[in-house]
Amino acid sequence: MLRCVYTDLDGTLLGRGASLFRDADGLFTLLPARALEACFRANVEVVLKSGRRKAQVMEDARLIGQTAYIFEMGCGLVIDGEETMLTGDLQPANGKTVHDLIEESGAPKLLLDTYAGRLEYHDPWHLNREISHLMRGLVDSDEADRLLEEHGLGNLRLVDNGAIAPKGSLPDLEGPPHVYHLIPRQASKADAVARHMRARGYSPEECIAVGDSREDVGVAAVVGRFFLVANAVEKDPDVMRGVPANVEVTEGRNGDGFYEAVVKALAER
């Protein structure tokens, strides 16, 4: 029996312009809303898992009538108003946020200097964040993690959160830019999802997840089925590299793919 759907926002539930009511091409659609309605009628919880700031995800969760959500790439989890920070040893203290502590470590400067012309802050969405440093460009995140480790910053990692539209400020990239989050190594969407499942008493077989990035695919390890929306593969074919057997690619893009995943999972429950 399906009891919970974990879904990413941008590039998954949301369409062009980050709208619930626009598809990948910008046309009006009700399919994502209908999928949410189907979940409501079937008593299935929907949990948003996003790289967005807490304030943004909180409002999005309220808009769809849900009381649990995951923010800043799994760095934080809120269940029925109770917040849990999942950032390991990096915790807010003495008036400083985790974002401040990461800044003081020198890690953001190291990455931006090393990958100058290939990596920059994701302006303006990098502002007013409490945990992750938000960047865009095109780098090998595994290589970046090794660089951090070599400089004594192995408690952090650079997370690839999927491809975005080209940016004029990065004209020399060899492919479409990606969004990256510099976060504590212990944090992940998969860990946050697993913690929510334990809190609610859900088994993996009772849960599915939907997403469009490599970090989203990591959630496949803790749920019964994972649906990768078609636009993820279109933008970044490498996202399919080494995926587990329970990952399926939808025919639809963005919210159409979310609808497809929900309807399929409900029909087979």
PLM feature segments, named:
Residues 2, 43, 66, 130, ...:
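A general structural motif
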Residues 17-38, 228-230:
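Basic, amphipathic juxtamembrane/active-site segments
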Residues 27-124:
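Active-site phosphate-binding/coordination module
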Residues 3-22, 48, 220:
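Asp-based phosphoryl-transfer active-site loop
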Residues 113-223:
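Conserved acidic, metal-coordinating active-site core of Asp-based
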Residues 13-25, 177-184:
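Glycine-rich phosphate-binding "P-loop"
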Residues 24, 85-105, 159-178, 237-241:
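Charged, glycine/proline-rich intrinsically disordered loops and linkers
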Residues 1-4, 28-29, 183-185, 190-269:
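Mg2+-dependent phosphoryl-transfer enzymes with acidic/Ser/Thr/Gly-rich catalytic loops
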